[in-house]
From Swiss-Prot:
It is found in: Cytoplasm. GO terms for biological process: response to stress. SMART domains: SprT (SM00731). Keywords: Cytoplasm, Metal-binding, Zinc. The active site is at residue 70. PROSITE patterns: ZINC_PROTEASE. Zn(2+) binds at residues 69, 73. Residues 13-156 form the SprT-like domain. It comes from the Bacteria. Pfam families: SprT-like (PF10263). It comes from Pseudomonas syringae pv. syringae (strain B728a). GO terms for cellular component: cytoplasm. This is Protein SprT.
């Protein structure tokens, strides 16, 4: 899986070098990205991070659009410095001029939402389910208290969880 992507990164750099007639420092490429982002360019670290799940599900478009998109950020930074806008004129110039691609800001890949566990808290009021996030549940375990707005009694963990 990473071989094709690494090869595409190298091809993008070679295209940029031919276009600008200069060399560019190659980045470190990582597959340590999760969530909704397909890729991230870390300008000061000269690092590209890619989402392996989105790559696997959208390989063709990922190689055609996402990889040049992220490489263009690093090229723009090396050419124009840190005072440019992330998807500004300079980046767009590279997308259109070097890669002959539309300068799309965001991908349209289907992103699966992960299931979320809710911890059910209750008070004496009838029908008083309060679904807490894992973070809020953790705060209660550390001693934080939450009160019902109706009866002003503390909310107590019922022992139940719900997956959404």
């Amino acid at each position: 899986m990473p071989d094709q992507l690494n090869s595409r990164v190298e091809t993008c750099y070679q295209q940029a070098e031919a276009f600008f007639k200069r060399t560019f420092k190659r980045p470190v490429v990582s597959f340590q990205l999760r969530g909704q982002k397909a890729g991230v360019a870390h300008l000061h670290e000269n690092l590209l991070r890619f989402n392996p799940q989105l790559y696997k599900e959208n390989a063709e478009d990922f190689l055609r659009q996402t990889v040049p998109h992220e490489v263009a950020h690093l090229i723009a930074h090396q050419l124009f410095g840190g005072s440019i806008q992330p998807h500004g004129e300079e980046w767009q110039l590279i997308m259109r001029g070097v890669y002959e691609l539309p300068p799309n800001r965001c991908h349209t890949y289907a992103v699966k939402r992960r299931s979320v566990i809710r911890y059910i808290y209750r008070c004496p009021c009838p029908d008083s389910d309060f679904p807490f996030t894992a973070q809020r549940h953790g705060m209660v375990r550390k001693g934080r208290r939450y009160l019902c707005r109706r009866c002003r009694e503390p909310l107590v963990f019922s022992g139940e969880t719900r997956t959404e």
